[in-house]
């Protein structure tokens, strides 16, 4: 089956910290995952693009049909550090397996850079 649904977990997000500001956390959109529409579908592909980012991308999923903050759990994480040039300019994807009803993306400790996008497809 080809993937035909592409949803934005986190749109372009920019933070140009000159060193005088504190890192902060960004939570993206809550979107329906594959199991929301397709019942037993458990394969999702998450793609993302960073430009000079320092922060931690966390993909979360939930099995709840009306999720509260306590219903979310981490399903994937990648750290980026612009100072050390570790994943700071990364364009990548990963396949995630799970019967998630909803998914969302977070950038924790966002200290600098541009998150161009974080998307899920199924």
PLM regions: where:
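Beta-sandwich interaction modules
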Residues: 34-41, 74-122
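N-terminal non-cleavable signal-anchor helices
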Residues: 15, 27, 32, 54, ...
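Extended, low-complexity, turn-rich repeat/linker tracts enriched in Gly/Pro/Ser/Thr and Asp/Glu
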Residues: 49-57, 110-114
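Structural beta-strand segments of beta-rich domains
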Residues: 42-46
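Residues within well-ordered beta-strands of beta-sheet-rich folds
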Residues: 47, 60, 104-106
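Transition segment at domain starts
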Residues: 1-41
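Extended, surface-exposed interaction regions
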Residues: 47-50, 96
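Short, surface-exposed beta-strand/strand-loop-strand elements in extracellular ectodomains
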Residues: 54-74, 117-121
